[in-house]
């Protein structure tokens, strides 16, 4: 088995970035359609990067949802996709690419389903499914996927795409129609399916069902001509979601073979229509009615905008054109193949993440794919589902005609045709002509899912073609009716093969399952389905491999109206389409594929519940009382494991619809699925053992743990019950977003004693319940399944408490609320029940049956009371929600929520449905007897009912599911009769369930015990043999070791003795030597002491002699040095005196010169001064003379004037004689002033002269000062020189002193050395005489430096 490939973090990061870039650039994904309806994410997977981005998104989106079980299962289940195993690697790349594209589209659908989670259908089946495929493919053939990635051209010019599309449009038209059928509108994201088109050459059919994988991406999958299996391309106006729904019903009416294609087209159209509409708006040129399969009564004019396979680099324009397929047209077949390879790789890479992500996105995407692959009905229903509200109706209609058998046929055809056409038919072509009636298709689904698809896929599992076929089968459930029938015939064999090979092919099947499962995600209400949808890679693989067979189960998961094809995948109607058809066929997955089976079962259950919600109209029973027919079909624990119970919290409103009861067509597959695998049982055991897992209702009702599968007979009975449209419709859906977890009301009911019918009044009104349920459902939708599980546990009291309560009035009260269900039972969410393999029929009877299961165990007598309460309660509830006018959101929720509201305690029972549609409940009651009858009701009717979930009529569960009208409310008596009948049926079902559960439990325990015994026996037997052989060897070795030990011991003792002897000898010798050494040391010490004393005396004498000699020599040296020093001093003094005299002479001479110069200059200045003085004197004289003359003139003039004035005065002033005196005084004053002026002028002149003299003197003073400064500078220089000389003299003196000291030191050193030499060993050559050069040098050295130094100075 191939090793599971976990998505790399780097890949995740790249994909995330790529995805974000794609979102920002609209390169990878084009959203079209109403945001409220189902936004169709057109994801252009022209490049592997884009696919990876989707994968990453899917992985990211579903990473939380993805279960380790899914991964482990999917991966453990070697992705023996027929083309993904080693065989797949060997298989043609085109098939792989087809599968990759399928997976890409599925994953895209899943992504969209997840994204739409609450309200939007999966935009692209491609998302998680592709990642699931990647897991499958990557695991089985990681190399192949890598190669494909390399092969797929990321950049495909639009021109090339357009060119290649022209040739391939026809081929892909069929493949696209198949893809359209398999891929709900959510598959709009083109995964370069166009490229898959060339790769996925229709092996036998030009229709292109084989292209379904390639065509899966709505945009790419549907190229003009591809859209129709016939190659007819029709440009369809963007149908509104409601239009898409409407068209899907008509498409459902298409011919059987084309019905699938039409179904695909419908789904694609419905889903793609929003996207294609927007896409066509964006890219009218791109718009290709690729999926216009006019084969049926109405060719679904799917305006499939083939999404340009955008090369991340080259096709940026694809952002707007992403929906269009023109790129594909321009692509050459080779390029398309490369793109398909890229898509395949993306799918394989995304498969790993997608399978993990199937929990949510794949859930939806898988359901979508399942619905698509499951059958045209399912897909059509899914398509209506994708459409906003109309999708529900259209989905119902589509499901009515599109039979699950179509999906199965597609699967069978996919498996059969793909097996033959491994290379080309990797995507199994869906021949719309091959589509069979819903019954046949349901059977085909069972066969295809269980056998033909799975068997063929398994058979071809080794080959890539086989795996692709698987994918094709999943994608294009178009198996021919004959193939479907053959698949039925081969069901038994195929089941065995599927169970065996499905285990290996779990991953492929899981991928298909993932594709089929996406539908539930399409519905926000079906969010439960989304949570379930995460089909573990195993389940996806199984669904891929078993898509032919498993599509049925996926379709069951997304319960198709007929064959469990849950075409709820239609992303548009998120809530109801999930429950598109009657009881989904439990996938026939081997035990190894429990995750995928669980996921599919959950998806089927959810879809069936949704279908039940949508199909309440189909329910003939007018009363709300739900017959207590056991609707729990024990699904394979594997499916549960795939679905992972954790994904479906106990109280999770998202719990997959309990309508797990396969239609009679699905009985075989269901029985196969119902057969629990020991592995699954083990996996589920903990959950089963968990008290919260089984509400008291289950405990009391005696419902067996999911591990206990109902016998095939019981399953058939359940299926029959489910087959009844109403029953199928009322597969108790998981709590829709609008529903309140049944445990909520149930707990309330339990808390409040139920007093007769009056207890109903205590229950919240249907509307209030719906509101509460919607609030809770929204909360649950917001919260992940885990939280929902927690909520469920909160809502439901401990199973023991619930048992007690259910046994008590609470159980009875719960019956009215839930119809006939015991409170404890409803406590268990539908998802949990589905996870445990208990699939509730999708009919009202299924809901009551689930209730009856709960109630039957507590007490069969209670059912009567319950039925009474249920009738009363349902009547008010019906009144509360009697009309279709209830808001579509509420309507959708209302079916589920009202069912849950009616049975708030039973999350799995759509009590509100009966409440909302009392007529539907009555019809259900009426059908309860029919429920006893084999569910022979046409799958079409079931499908139509399933499609109805969105309509408010769904809660009514009328038999006329397509109609939204509510049947007239039957009177209370009729309802009572129906309730009683339902109670009886429930009692019977519960008894059978208990019997079957006990038998299965015992059988399983016996099998498990036997297996354990065999394993343990084998283990211990082998262990004992090995132990004996090893024991012998060890005994021999032990004997040898003992011998060696004895020998070594003897040797060691001998050595020890020798050692002791040697030690004694050594000690004795040591003592002897010690004594000898001490004696020698003493003798040596004495001798050395004597020698030392003699030598010391001799050395002292010699030292004295040498000291005397050294003193004499030193004295002589000192005298010589002193004499030489004195002589040097005298010489230096003489030289200094001479230098001083010379300097003084020079100084005197210079001073004299300066004096003479100064005198000369002084004389010159005096002469100049004199000259100037004389000149100035002359000027003064001149000026004085002039002033005298002027004064004279002034006097004369004054005299004349005076005379004149006197005369005049005398004449004129005769009377004024005194004026003369004044005049005289004034004259005197003037004279005085004149004198002062003259004096001042003289002073001024003198001062001027003094100033001139001062100036001259100042100049002379400056000159003298300069001279004085020069002389001072010279004196300073002389003094500096004198100081330097004196310093030098002092230095010389110091040097002389130092030399003297040095000489003294040297003399002392010499003396010491001589003394040492003399006192030393006479033979020593170092000894020197006083006359040696050392002495001479020492004696002469000191004086010479002084002389040398002084001499230069």
Curated annotation (Swiss-Prot):
Top-level taxon: Eukaryota
Recorded GO MF terms: microtubule binding; protein homodimerization activity
GO cellular component: centrosome; cytoplasmic microtubule; intercellular bridge; nucleus
Tissue: Expressed in heart from early embryonic development onwards. Later during embryonic development, expressed in brain and nervous system, in limb buds and in the epithelium lining the bronchia of the lung. Detected in adult brain, heart and eye, but not detected in other adult tissues examined.
Location of the region described as Disordered in the Swiss-Prot/TrEMBL record: 1-30, 81-101, 125-259, 274-615, 799-823, 847-972, 1315-1353
Predominant subcellular localization, coarse grouping: cytoplasm
Keyword Phosphoprotein: yes
Biased composition (Low complexity): 530-541, 805-818, 893-904, 1332-1353
Residues modified as Phosphoserine: 364-365
Residue spans of biased composition, Basic and acidic residues class: 145-172, 325-345, 483-492, 598-614, 921-933
Stretches the record annotates as Localization to the growing distal tip of microtubules: 786-1134
Subcellular location field: Cytoplasm, Cytoskeleton
InterPro entries: MTUS1/CCDC69 (IPR051293)
UniProt keywords, alphabetically: Coiled coil, Cytoplasm, Cytoskeleton, Microtubule, Phosphoprotein
Record field: compositional bias (Polar residues): 89-101, 239-251, 347-356, 566-581, 853-871
Region of interest (Mediates interaction with MAPRE1), residue spans: 626-964
Coiled coil ranges: 976-1319
Region Sufficient for interaction with KIF2C, annotated ranges: 786-874
Task of the protein: Binds microtubules. Together with MAPRE1 may target the microtubule depolymerase KIF2C to the plus-end of microtubules. May regulate the dynamics of microtubules at their growing distal tip.
Quaternary assembly: Homodimer. Interacts with KIF2C and MAPRE1; the interaction is direct and probably targets MTUS2 and KIF2C to microtubules.
Stated name of the protein: Microtubule-associated tumor suppressor candidate 2 homolog
Organism field: Mus musculus
């Amino acid at each position: 088995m191939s090793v599971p490939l976990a998505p790399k973090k780097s890949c995740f990061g790249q994909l995330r970035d790529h995805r974000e870039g794609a979102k920002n650039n609209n390169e990878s994904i084009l959203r079209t359609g109403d945001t409220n309806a189902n936004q169709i994410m057109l994801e252009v997977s022209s490049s592997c990067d884009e696919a990876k981005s989707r994968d990453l998104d899917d992985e990211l989106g579903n990473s939380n949802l993805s279960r380790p079980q899914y991964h482990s299962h999917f991966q453990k289940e070697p992705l023996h996709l027929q083309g993904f195993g080693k065989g797949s690697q060997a298989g043609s790349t085109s098939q792989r690419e087809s599968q990759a594209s399928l997976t890409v589209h599925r994953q895209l659908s899943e992504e969209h389903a997840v994204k739409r989670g609450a309200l939007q259908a999966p935009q692209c089946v491609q998302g998680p499914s592709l990642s699931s495929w990647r897991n499958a493919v990557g695991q089985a053939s990681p190399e192949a996927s890598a190669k494909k990635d390399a092969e797929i051209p990321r950049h495909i010019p639009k021109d090339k795409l357009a060119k290649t599309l022209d040739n391939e449009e026809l081929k892909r038209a069929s493949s696209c129609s198949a893809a359209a059928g398999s891929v709900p509108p959510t598959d709009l994201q083109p995964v370069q399916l166009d490229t898959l088109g060339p790769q996925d050459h229709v092996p036998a059919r030009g229709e292109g069902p084989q292209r379904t994988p390639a065509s899966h991406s709505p945009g790419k999958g549907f190229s003009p001509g591809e859209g129709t299996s016939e190659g007819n391309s029709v440009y369809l106006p963007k149908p509104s979601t409601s239009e898409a729904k409407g068209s899907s019903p008509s498409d459902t009416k298409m011919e059987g073979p084309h019905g699938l294609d039409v179904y695909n087209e419908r789904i694609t159209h419905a889903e793609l229509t929003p996207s294609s509409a927007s896409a066509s708006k964006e890219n009218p040129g791109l718009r290709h009615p690729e999926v216009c399969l006019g084969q049926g009564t109405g060719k679904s004019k799917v305006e499939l905008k083939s999404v340009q396979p955008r090369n991340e680099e080259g096709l940026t324009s694809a952002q707007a054109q992403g929906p269009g397929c023109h790129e594909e047209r321009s692509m050459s077949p080779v390029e398309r193949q490369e793109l398909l390879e890229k898509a395949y790789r993306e799918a394989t890479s995304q498969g790993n993440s997608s399978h993990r992500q199937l929990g949510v996105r794949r859930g939806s995407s898988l359901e979508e794919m399942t619905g698509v692959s499951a059958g045209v009905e399912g897909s059509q229903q899914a398509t209506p589902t994708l459409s906003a509200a109309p999708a529900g109706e259209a989905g119902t209609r589509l499901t009515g005609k599109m039979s699950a058998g179509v999906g199965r046929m597609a699967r069978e055809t996919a498996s059969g045709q793909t097996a033959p056409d491994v290379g080309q038919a990797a995507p199994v072509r869906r021949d719309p002509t091959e589509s069979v009636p819903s019954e046949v298709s349901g059977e085909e689904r069972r066969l295809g899912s269980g056998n033909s698809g799975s068997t063929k896929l398994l058979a071809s599992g080794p080959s890539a073609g086989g795996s692709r076929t698987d994918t094709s089968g999943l994608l294009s459930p178009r198996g021919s009716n004959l193939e479907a029938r053959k698949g039925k015939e081969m069901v038994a064999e195929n089941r065995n093969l599927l169970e065996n090979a499905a285990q290996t092919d779990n991953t492929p099947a899981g991928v298909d399952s993932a594709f089929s499962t996406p539908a539930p995600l399409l519905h926000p209400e079906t969010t439960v389905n989304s949570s379930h949808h995460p089909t573990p890679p195993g389940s996806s693989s199984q669904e891929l491999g078993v898509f032919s067979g498993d599509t049925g189960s996926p379709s069951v998961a997304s319960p198709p109206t007929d064959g469990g094809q849950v075409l709820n995948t239609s992303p548009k109607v998120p809530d109801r389409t999930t429950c598109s058809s009657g009881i989904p066929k439990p996938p026939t997955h081997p035990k190894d594929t429990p995750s995928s089976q669980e996921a599919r079962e959950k998806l089927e259950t959810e879809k069936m519940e949704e279908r039940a919600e949508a199909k309440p109209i189909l329910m003939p029973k007018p009363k709300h009382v739900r017959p207590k027919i056991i609707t729990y079909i024990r699904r394979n624990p594997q499916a549960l494991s795939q679905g992972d119970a954790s994904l479906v919290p106990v109280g999770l409103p998202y719990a997959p619809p309990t309508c797990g009861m396969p239609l009679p067509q699905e009985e075989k597959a269901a029985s196969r699925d119902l057969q629990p695998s020991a592995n699954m049982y083990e996996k589920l055991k903990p959950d089963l053992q968990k008290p919260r897992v089984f509400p008291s209702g289950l405990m009391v009702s005696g419902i067996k743990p999911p591990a206990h599968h109902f016998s095939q007979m019981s399953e058939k009975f359940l299926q029959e019950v489910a087959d009844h449209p109403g029953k199928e419709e009322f597969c108790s859906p998981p709590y829709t977003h609008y529903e309140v977890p049944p445990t909520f009301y149930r707990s309330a009911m339990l808390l409040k004693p139920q007093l007769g019918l009056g207890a109903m009044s205590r229950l919240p009104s249907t509307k209030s319940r719906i509101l509460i349920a919607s609030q809770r459902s929204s909360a649950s939708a917001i919260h992940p399944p885990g939280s929902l599980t927690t909520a469920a546990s909160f809502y439901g009291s401990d199973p023991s408490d619930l048992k007690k309560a259910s046994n008590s009035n609470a159980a009875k009260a719960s019956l009215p609320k839930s119809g006939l269900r015991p409170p404890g039972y409803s406590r268990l969410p539908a998802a949990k029940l589905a996870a445990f393999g208990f699939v509730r029929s999708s009919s009202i009877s299924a809901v009551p049956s689930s209730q009856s299961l709960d109630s039957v165990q507590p007490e069969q007598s209670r059912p009567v009371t319950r039925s009474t309460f249920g009738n009363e309660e349902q009547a008010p509830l019906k009144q509360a929600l009697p009309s279709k006018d209830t808001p579509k959101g509420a309507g959708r929720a209302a079916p589920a929520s009202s069912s849950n509201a009616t049975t708030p305690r039973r999350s799995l029972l759509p009590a509100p449905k009966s409440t909302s549609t009392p007529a539907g409940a009555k019809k259900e009651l009426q059908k309860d007897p029919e429920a006893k009858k084999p569910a022979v009701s046409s799958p079409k009717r079931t499908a139509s009912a399933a499609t109805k979930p969105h309509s408010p009529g769904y809660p009514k569960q009328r038999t006329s599911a397509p109609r939204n009208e509510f049947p007239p409310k039957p009177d209370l008596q009729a309802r009572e009769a129906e309730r009683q009948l339902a109670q009886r049926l429930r009692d019977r079902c519960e008894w059978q369930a208990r019997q079957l559960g006990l038998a299965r439990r015992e059988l399983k325990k016996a099998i498990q015990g036997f297996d354990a015994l065999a394993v343990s026996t084998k283990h211990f037997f082998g262990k004992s043999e090995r132990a004996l052989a090893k024991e012998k060897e060890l005994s021999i070795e032990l004997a040898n070791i003992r011998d060696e030990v004895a020998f070594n011991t003897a040797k060691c003792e001998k050595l020890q003795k020798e050692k002791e002897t040697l030690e004694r000898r050594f000690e004795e010798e040591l003592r002897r030597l010690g004594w000898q050494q001490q004696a020698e040391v003493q003798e040596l010490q004495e001798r050395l002491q004597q020698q030392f004393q003699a030598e010391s005396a001799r050395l002292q004498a010699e030292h004295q002699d040498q000291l005397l000699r050294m003193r004499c020599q030193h004295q002589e040296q000192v005298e010589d040095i002193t004499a030489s020093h004195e002589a040097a001093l005298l010489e230096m003094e003489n030289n200094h005196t001479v230098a001083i005299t010379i300097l003084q002479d020079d100084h005197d001479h210079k001073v004299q010169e300066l004096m003479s110069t100064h005198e000369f200059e002084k004389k010159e200045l005096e002469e100049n001064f004199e000259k100037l003085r004389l000149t100035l004197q002359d000027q003064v004289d001149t000026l004085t003379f002039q002033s005298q003359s002027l004064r004279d003139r002034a006097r004369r003039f004054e005299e004349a004037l005076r005379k004149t004035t006197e005369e005049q005065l005398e004449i004129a002033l005769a009377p004024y004689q005194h004026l003369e005196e004044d005049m005289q005084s004034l004259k005197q004053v003037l004279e005085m002033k004149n004198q002062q002026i003259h004096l001042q002028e003289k002073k001024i002149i003198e001062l001027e002269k003094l100033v001139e003299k001062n100036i001259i003197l100042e100049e002379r003073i400056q000159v003298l000062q300069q001279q004085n400064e020069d002389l001072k500078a010279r004196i300073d220089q002389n003094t500096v020189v004198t100081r330097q000389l004196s310093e030098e003299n002092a230095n010389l003196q110091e040097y002389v002193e130092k030399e003297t000291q040095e000489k003294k030191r040297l003399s002392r050193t010499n003396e010491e050395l001589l003394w040492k030499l003399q006192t030393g060993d006479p033979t020593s050559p170092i000894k020197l005489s006083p006359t040696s050069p050392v002495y001479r040098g020492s004696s002469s050295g000191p004086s010479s430096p002084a002389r040398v130094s002084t001499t230069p100075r």
